[in-house]
Amino acid sequence: MIILIPAYKPDESLVRLAQQITELDAHAEILVVDDGSGSTYVPIFTELAIRGVTIIAHPANRGKGAALRTGLAWAR
């Protein structure tokens, strides 16, 4: 199972969410699409990657729909 999460300028709650998902289903694959959040948010995405979350980054904000399309294309 792949769980797709679009993210723009996330906070630590995204890290907690990923942890909770992993606790519920250790086999779930989490995919986060960073929709151009910028360098300020690199520590959050780095923490997610350390925890085994797959990160795909848009260089600029393209909107939630574009982030979802990117994630769906990757998942196929």
Over which residues does each language-model region extend?
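Short beta-strand/turn micro-motifs composed of small residues
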Residues: 5-7, 34
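Short glycine-/acidic-enriched loop or helix-start segments at secondary-structure transitions
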Residues: 14-15, 41-43, 67
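Short, well-formed alpha-helical segments that are part of the catalytic scaffolds
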Residues: 9-24
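Donor nucleotide-sugar binding loop of glycosyltransferases
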Residues: 10-13, 37, 64
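Amphipathic, non-transmembrane alpha-helical secondary structure
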Residues: 15-19, 29, 69, 73
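Cell-envelope/extracellular polymer assembly enzymes that use nucleotide-activated donors
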Residues: 1-2, 29
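A conserved acidic beta->alpha catalytic loop
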Residues: 34-42
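Conserved donor nucleotide-binding strand/loop of the catalytic core
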Residues: 45-74
